[in-house]
């Protein structure tokens, strides 16, 4: 298993699912040759039954996603409907925080804090070492 495959498994294990567009954003591949190696790696991981790939076609209030969705094979939860939309938006926020060089401390979905119920809760440390959170 090479370094790219290990990074992909680590990220998907933390976020539960990612789309192909989010992989491209995360690894910032602008040249076609690097994109092809990422696609080949994802295809190889699907053929080896490490990942499961599903088509994804979502249009939710300006958030559009038409690429493929990747899960770890054998994970206990596959999301559908509103849960899938919440999961993808949460994954997209986490990818953008990682691209901004913020350190993620906690990443939760469907959590109760006190009397409040949140669909998404992300706690991170910004570049000035201040702990901040995103609740939705």
Task: Label the predicted regions.
Residues 1-78:
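Nuclease-adjacent, charged terminal/linker segments that flank catalytic cores
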Residues 45-48, 77-85, 124-135:
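Short, Lys/Arg-enriched charge-dense amphipathic segments
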Residues 53-56, 85-90, 133-136:
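Short, surface-exposed, charge-dense and proline/glycine-enriched linear segments
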Residues 64-111:
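Solvent-exposed, charged helical/coil patches
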Residues 96-136:
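Active-site metal-binding core of divalent-cation-utilizing nuclease and nuclease-like domains
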């Amino acid at each position: 298993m090479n370094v790219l495959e290990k990074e992909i498994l680590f990220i998907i294990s933390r976020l539960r699912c990612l789309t192909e567009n989010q992989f491209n954003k995360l690894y910032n591949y602008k040249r076609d040759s690097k994109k092809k190696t990422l696609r080949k790696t994802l295809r190889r991981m699907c053929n080896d039954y490490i990942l499961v790939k599903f088509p994804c076609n979502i249009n939710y209030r300006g958030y559009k996603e038409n690429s493929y969705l990747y899960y770890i094979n054998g994970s206990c939860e596959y999301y559908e409907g509103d849960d899938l939309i919440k999961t993808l938006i949460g994954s997209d926020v986490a990818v953008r925080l990682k691209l901004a060089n913020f350190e993620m401390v906690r990443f939760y979905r469907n959590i109760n804090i006190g009397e409040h119920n949140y669909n998404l809760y992300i706690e991170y440390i910004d570049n000035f070492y201040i702990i901040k959170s995103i609740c939705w």
